Amino acid sequence: MALKIRLARAGSKKRPYYHVVVADVRAPRDGRFIETVGSWNPVLPKDAERVKLDAERIQHWIAQGAQPTDRVLRFLDQAGIAKRPSRNNPTKGEPGKKAQERLALAKQAEEEASAKAAEAAAAAAAPAEEAASE
């Protein structure tokens, strides 16, 4: 039986409250579960009362093979119970293919414009030197 440590929604409409439960992966989100190991009240301000976890039972279930979901793993990482690996994707922030092509064209046009300006400045400076030497 594959186990997950996940959130089960409770509370009323527009007032969410979640139980952190150990459940079979095939069970419905708010359905049958094995044990409640904590709670999360997102309505409260960020403090110690917002997330309550039973660290001993969570470690027991992780040792039994239960896998925490991403959100629960964030809570466990904040509490120091489990380590959440960082997801590093350095290429995510880069512009797309078309945007990179546009940037390359703009850079090339800028280089050509600066080269023309340098040639014009050199041409303007050259006659003055020739006149001074004669």
Curated annotation (Swiss-Prot):
Give the start-end ranges of region Disordered.
79-134
The Gene Ontology biological process annotation of the record reads: translation
Keywords noted in UniProt: Ribonucleoprotein, Ribosomal protein
In terms of InterPro entries, this protein maps to:
Ribosomal_bS16, Ribosomal_bS16_dom_sf
Q: Is the keyword Ribosomal protein assigned to this protein?
A: yes
The family annotation for this protein states: Belongs to the bacterial ribosomal protein bS16 family.
Question: Which NCBIfam families does UniProt cross-reference here?
Answer: S16 (TIGR00002)
Q: What is this protein called?
A: Small ribosomal subunit protein bS16
Organism the protein comes from: Brucella abortus (strain 2308)
